[in-house]
């Protein structure tokens, strides 16, 4: 298997995309395939550049055994060259990514996270930033399901 590079993208890179990165990293690690994947996350905005994930997301992630150590970074046009798949959390992310894509090849690298869900059905991964505790739990549930589906999709 060739190395696959996957970039998860949300708005600020402090809740959903770093969580998706951690979930997918765990799945890859548990299957002994860490050397076969490059996994990262980014945000469409640079507002939180350099910050750790939101403290609430880190708390709920830790309850499930995930440790979010990623520091937020903004999406860069060069990410189209550096990643095989760029996975957005909601339609706003997808639209912003498509607006940055300069070629059909770049546009074809863009996917919706929820399209990989197997057991849960959702139209997007909602941003939990302005919501309550249950929103963070729901996001992790969606991401665990979608990341498992993504792993299966890649026929690993």
Where are these predicted regions, by residue range?
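Acidic pyrophosphate-coordinating catalytic loop
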Residues: 46-51, 79, 89, 102, ...
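Phosphate-binding/catalytic loops
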Residues: 85, 91-156
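Conserved active-site segments centered on acidic
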Residues: 1-82, 152-156
């Amino acid at each position: 298997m060739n190395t696959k590079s996957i970039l998860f993208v949300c708005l600020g890179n402090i809740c959903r995309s770093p969580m998706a990165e951690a979930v997918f990293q765990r799945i890859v690690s548990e299957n002994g395939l860490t050397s076969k994947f490059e996994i990262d996350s980014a945000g469409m905005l640079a507002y939180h550049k350099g910050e750790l994930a939101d403290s609430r997301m880190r708390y709920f992630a830790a309850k499930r055994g995930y440790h979010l150590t990623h520091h937020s970074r903004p999406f860069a046009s060069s990410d189209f060259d550096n990643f095989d798949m760029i996975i957005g959390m909601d339609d706003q992310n997808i639209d912003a990514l498509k607006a940055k894509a300069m070629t059909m090849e770049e546009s074809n690298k863009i996917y919706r996270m929820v399209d990989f869900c197997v057991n849960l059905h959702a139209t997007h991964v909602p941003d939990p930033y302005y919501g309550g505790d249950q929103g963070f739990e729901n996001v992790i549930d969606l991401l665990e399901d979608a990341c498992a589906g993504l792993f299966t999709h890649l026929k690993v």
